[in-house]
Amino acid sequence: SHAEFLRAIEALRDRVRGDKALTERILHKYSIKNVMGMNLLPLVRFDDPFEIIAHLMVGSEGTLAFLAGVTMRTEREYEHKASAMVYFSDIGEASRAVVEMRKLQDSAGERIVHSAEMLDRKSLASVGDATGEGLTAVLTETKAHTPEELAANVARIGELLGRFTLYVPARFTDDPAEQAKFWALRSGIFPAVGGSRPAGTTCLIEDVAFHIGDLPRATAELQALIARHGYDDACIYGHALEGNYHFIINQSFSTPAEAARYEALMDDVAELVVGRYDGSLKAEHGTGRNMAPFLRREWGDAACAVMRAVKELFDPAGLLNPGVIFNDDPRCHLSHFKPLPLTDPLIDRCIECGFCEVNCLTCGLTLSSRQRIVVRREIARLKASGGNPRLVRELERGYRYPGERT
């Protein structure tokens, strides 16, 4: 029996609900995308301890339990879709348009704009969009169950966009092939930016979220902040309809000055997102070690204490994914940098994102493409440092079959 465990869950539930300020804080934080820290919303939303336990798993990043299987419940797909790449000369104007598009609803009170993906000028340049210099685009999608509903949606969105200054008139298409080209541009940003980065640098992607009303000012300030720290090749893109942006930087950690520049950037990002706008430092991708030092700054003492209590209840020995979400080192994001030694011109372009593995012919047979690259980089690192020649020989010998013959 796990009666004691269940009683502890109920006690945490009651502790949270008995603190009005904390309850309101939790509801406010989850009014936008937020995966920073442990998921506290189940303690507010559910009464049954089993439901609370199941929902605590969401976003726990392996710190509470091992998930052996997941069943996904899919939603019905709309039969009719239309997309447009809407170009603006100014990122602030683009953000204001997104805020207004989010308000559009059908007769049932459902949003008629289903996606509004922001692509700033560097994002567009990375994927070869030549529409114009220095533009910002919003990839906009609407969906419907009938052609008539789709046409009505497109007309309403077009009417709204007519109130804004566009670089060229918006043109929606319901052609699946044309829409696929738009979305291929969107999905190609991360690998394009990473693949063109200076050799030896690390491609880092962060994702933050703002409340939708703050989006125009926050977007411009985030762009200016990144530029102020000298990241001239950085780009901002993402799910603007949800106030959620990704930004990509190419960072060298080869000198103390570069590490200090990165530290200053992250401190300023935290101050902008949390201190100024009370947003989320992590909207989708999980806290990880890079944001763990900023957990208390975002959530405050009371919420962090509950998160710690959840962790200690599930994992009293601290064995599961240590250092992730909770880390007592306030500078843990500035140590143990992963080296990317120069290895081969082709290999040096790899950002180790793993997107290629779904199409890799040898993944599961011997080594995937990414695994081969990791081994090659480790051999190069050991050779460059002059350390452990015995390990170098073992790696080279062991690599021959899985890395070269298959």
What is each stretch, according to the model?
Residues 350:
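Short Cys/His-rich zinc-binding micro-motifs
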